[in-house]
Amino acid sequence: LLEAQKKGWIRFIGITNHRRTVAEQAVLSGKYDTLQFPFSSISDEGDIKLAELTRDHDMGFIAMKGLAGGLIVNAKTTFAFMKQHPWVVPIWGIQRESELNEFLELEKNPPAYDDEMKALIEKDRKELAGNFCHGCGYCLPCPAGIPIPNAARMSLLLRRSPYQGWLSEEMNAEMMKV
């Protein structure tokens, strides 16, 4: 890739990673222009320091899973959090026009990052933070046909998203593979 960049075939080289230690090594290597890493309002202090490290090394930071793979249901919280890190470019994972409209409105009228917002974020952190599945699907395909991201997050999906689809006969058959 470095050779292709020198020849002008590509302009930038980026890396995507889910492991903080590997991501830190990539930043410190000086070989990459961007880092794509899971980052949202439930990110811990280590993830925030990683984002700051990219800023300090003049490296782009792309926040994947800005809504934690759909587990953060209040877009305002993560939007307000992201605005505290203006060098971070989030990938929101918008799937519907209504979601696009919500983010366009948030961009026009950003919510305050106040004590109320911080309390909502802290509630999400207590429920979701830690080593949990972000739903990226990097673990797929499973040789046994198990939908690993759904299985790993099922208890959260049932509580934090419209649950009816998860209770179908088809989904029950999928979960019986586990």
Located regions from the model:
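Glycine/proline-rich, positively charged
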Residues: 1-62, 67-70
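Structured C-terminal cap/extension of enzyme domains
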Residues: 49-178
